[in-house]
């Protein structure tokens, strides 16, 4: 984001923006969109042991239990008779693939279905609760995947932190917890004058 003037207004937009405009964009709505019998939903709920899964999906993805599928490998090898002297190499690989299927489901299906859901979100263009508050020439840092700040308020040069659904070739970034990598972060914030 290029700021040409020290008095430029910066709007930081999160999911509250879409929700305030009547867009059903909470992760619990994504869960509902998947449906009760969705293989992806069942896999997420089985392998992510986090009570906040559907309220904080991005952070919950960091809690993906990779040990459980790995521990299932010996069981699958037995089920596919991969230890049998007459077993083929294909039996061994089939057992490994079956044990790792949950990880594959999450890493491959989740991005596709998430994008499809994001692309299905619509906004009523007559609902503009922020009319009169948005300043011309402002800059926008948008954590959403939707372009509603642009379509409703004419925002220009929006920086989409996690990607935008408008760019169909780009991947949307989902999941960003650093808690396993950063144990203690201390940041000194500068003091600002009013």
Feature locations, PLM:
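SIR2/sirtuin NAD+-dependent deacylase catalytic core
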Residues: 2-194
């Amino acid at each position: 984001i290029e700021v040409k003037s020290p008095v430029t207004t910066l709007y930081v937009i999160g999911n509250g923006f879409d929700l305030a405009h009547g867009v059903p964009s909470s992760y619990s709505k994504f869960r509902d969109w998947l449906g009760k019998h969705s293989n992806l939903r069942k896999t997420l709920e089985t392998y992510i042991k986090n009570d906040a899964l559907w309220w904080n999906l991005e952070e919950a993805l960091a809690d993906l239990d990779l040990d459980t599928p790995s521990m299932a490998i010996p069981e699958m090898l037995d089920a596919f008779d991969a230890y049998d002297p007459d077993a083929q190499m294909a039996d061994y690989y089939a057992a490994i693939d079956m044990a790792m299927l949950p990880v594959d489901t999450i890493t491959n299906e989740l991005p596709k279905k998430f994008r499809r859901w994001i692309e299905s979100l619509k906004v009523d263009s007559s609902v503009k609760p922020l009319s009169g508050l948005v300043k011309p020439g402002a800059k926008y840092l948008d954590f959403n995947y939707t372009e509603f700040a642009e379509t409703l308020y004419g925002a220009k040069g929006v920086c989409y932190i996690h990607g935008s659904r408008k760019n169909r070739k780009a991947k949307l970034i989902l999941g960003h917890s650093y808690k396993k990598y950063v144990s203690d972060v201390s940041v000194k914030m500068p003091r600002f004058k009013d």
